[in-house]
């Protein structure tokens, strides 16, 4: 079944480029940039990938991102991910990047963007993988800082297809960023947002009504609100669900408890994605395979999930 799932044409719509930084590349970039790491070797770093919640993961995620310094570093990060896409027949990807993770460390916005964009361009030309980049604001930072990031992005307007919202969800509702998203949409950006992962269904309502998003990233807690579920079904609003991430971060205690197939059968436009694959133990195919192994996902369900991902593209 793994080989069949791997060969299935699919799109990935929920992937953080910084979260695809594999330990081997992290160590190579640390050596290139002469950065001392708190782990002795790759295996020690892998063993640190034991999280009890989103915040514990994010602490390690931001620490790992510190090795990314130059355009070449961001190119290498993105190119490694695209090669993985090619090996798993991901024919289209819409990755996130978090400029504030890097600009707050003194890395110029254009250094980050140039490295990523050159890799995406090469991916289109050399690998045949179409793509669109999403600029994501960090919700644990202030609205003012998000506005500054949008200011930095506007000269490069054509480099992005959308703005997004990620990082620590609890205590940071979408409404905090309503004015930023209003402005981004007035500049021609589409909008997506993480909502309903650790946060309540109310955050999904806010993302839909205040941020006016086209896609819900995660959204698994929508199932707790019947009226919300009906709206998502009626309007066919896509959900970019990340099964391995959800179990690794204890959104669900075990994959056998995941609700993605329940939502699929109710008519929700759910998709399968890897989120931060270097940290969560699998890329898109591994996420599909986990659904087959633990939930008995059928070939028909897999085809529908893959088709949903292709249908839910912004570009």
From Swiss-Prot:
EC number: 3.5.4.2
Catalytic activity: adenine + H2O + H(+) = hypoxanthine + NH4(+)
Residue ranges of coiled coil: none
Family affiliation: Belongs to the metallo-dependent hydrolases superfamily. Adenosine and AMP deaminases family. Adenine deaminase type 2 subfamily.
Active site (record annotation): 197 (proton donor)
A GO term from the CC aspect: cytosol
Function as written in the Swiss-Prot or TrEMBL entry: Catalyzes the hydrolytic deamination of adenine to hypoxanthine. Plays an important role in the purine salvage pathway and in nitrogen catabolism.
InterPro entries in alphabetical order: A_deaminase_dom, ADE, Ado/ade_deaminase, Metal_Hydrolase
Residue sites binding substrate per the record: 276
GO molecular function: adenine deaminase activity; zinc ion binding
Protein name (Swiss-Prot/TrEMBL): Adenine deaminase
A Pfam family this chain is assigned to: A_deaminase
Residues that coordinate or bind Zn(2+): 14, 16, 194, 275
Site residues (Important for catalytic activity), renumbered to this chain: 218
Lineage: Bacteria, Pseudomonadati, Pseudomonadota, Gammaproteobacteria, Pseudomonadales
Cofactor(s) the protein requires to work: Zn(2+)
Naturally occurring in which organism (per UniProt): Pseudomonas putida (strain W619)
